[in-house]
Amino acid sequence: MYKAKRTAAQKVRRCLGKYELGRAIGQGTFAKVRFAKNMETGDHVAIKILDKAKVQKHRLVEQIRREICTMKLIQHPNVVHLHEVMGSKTRIFIVLEYVMGGELHDIIATSGRLKEDEARKYFQQLINAVDYCHSRGVYHRDLKLENLLLDTAGNIKVSDFGLSAISEQVKADGLLHTTCGTPNYVAPEVIEDKGYDGALADLWSCGVILFVLLAGYLPFEDENIVSLYNKISGAQFTCPSWFSAEAKRLIARILDPNPATRITTSQVLQDQWFKKGYESPVFDDKYYPYFHDVYDAFGDSEEKHVKEAMEEQPTLMNAFELISLNKGLNLDNFFESDKKYKRETRFTSQCPPKEIINRIEEAANLLGFNIQKRNYRMRMENIKEGRKGHLNIATEVFQVAPSLHVVELKKAKGDTLEFQKFYQTLSTQLKDVVWELEDAAEDMS
């Protein structure tokens, strides 16, 4: 018989509480992001994983904790949703909404500028999300195309609040003082580092984004960082000829280098160009977040830590191994033609692999067999000695498809006829587990 286990790849499932972790989809200085699935609901999520030691070494505990608390304050259809926060002894896990449509930046990079109506739709969603955040005292401070994701319906989802600042942390002069953000999108007052209004700085970045959507390129670019900052501080940009007069007027009011005279978000919402086709999102914003899970995640209490586990999955059969199970194509059968009974057999099942292996164990125990089990492999030995010693049977569950498994039973020691009788009794007891047995004719050579 072809030995499936020699070539089949063993799958190992990495579990984090109720989540199954998948491939890495992002990597930063302090965090890795993995695709994951909620095993209870089947929903896909993204889990940001932070190393506690690295965070503590760089004295970023408070900043990361603030980021998490900030995201919990935000419940808006155009902002990436934070589901929950968990912790282990060594890591922090931030469970986020998984946004499947990619980055808005990629659309511009591959297709160039957008039509005005399409750009306006994205800008409307962005402004609505930003206005919502500001109303709750939350400022993004790093708005750029790369942080604007798209869902499957083509709607914006603002991501990455790693540089956000809560209004409670504003200094006595009522201004923020930390310089951050991406150079091409940053407001002049942020560059000057004299303190700035977070809402007005965010709006400047929104103006840069609108320009890029309509033009296909940045309004402020220069290889020399000093020259770039000079262009930003002086608002040295020119709108292309294809911009409508209304769009030019709005962009000029947003990209005003003087924050005291710059248009506000509430004024943008009343702008005639902006209001064209505008539909305010309807959603329930009566949300009162709790923060105890954030402190539990950063704490040292093992009782409140999430369980991490590596779980072996059934071996996955490839196409050649499946073909070898077909008696007509299996060359091993030529060498077994003189044997009355086969020393191995199998059946298929649509039950979960854990249920299959547990049911076999229960039935074998009732038939007087001792069991040794490891994941989806099992060795069964009859307590009573038979005609040729103790009957010993090796069993393994293989995965053929997500909901289809092959269960293989092989006689390792003992009498072949006793093995066949055992299998007939076992398959009868497992009739609700067995989907299809090998053809009865294949039980005889």
Swiss-Prot record:
Active site: which residues?
Answer: D142 (proton acceptor)
Please give the InterPro entries that the UniProt record associates with this protein. Kinase-like_dom_sf (IPR011009), NAF/FISL_domain (IPR018451), NAF_dom (IPR004041), Prot_kinase_dom (IPR000719), Protein_kinase_ATP_BS (IPR017441), Ser/Thr_kinase_AS (IPR008271)
Q: Where do the segments described as PPI lie?
A: 342-371
> What biological processes does GO assign it?
signal transduction
Give the Gene Ontology MF terms in alphabetical order.
ATP binding; protein serine kinase activity; protein serine/threonine kinase activity
What EC number(s) has UniProt assigned to this enzyme?
2.7.11.1
What is its cofactor?
A: Mn(2+)
Family, per the entry? Belongs to the protein kinase superfamily. CAMK Ser/Thr protein kinase family. SNF1 subfamily.
Q: What does this protein do?
A: CIPK serine-threonine protein kinases interact with CBL proteins. Binding of a CBL protein to the regulatory NAF domain of CIPK protein lead to the activation of the kinase in a calcium-dependent manner.
Q: What is this protein called?
A: CBL-interacting protein kinase 3
The record lists the organism as Oryza sativa subsp. japonica (Rice)
Q: What is the primary gene name for this protein?
A: CIPK3
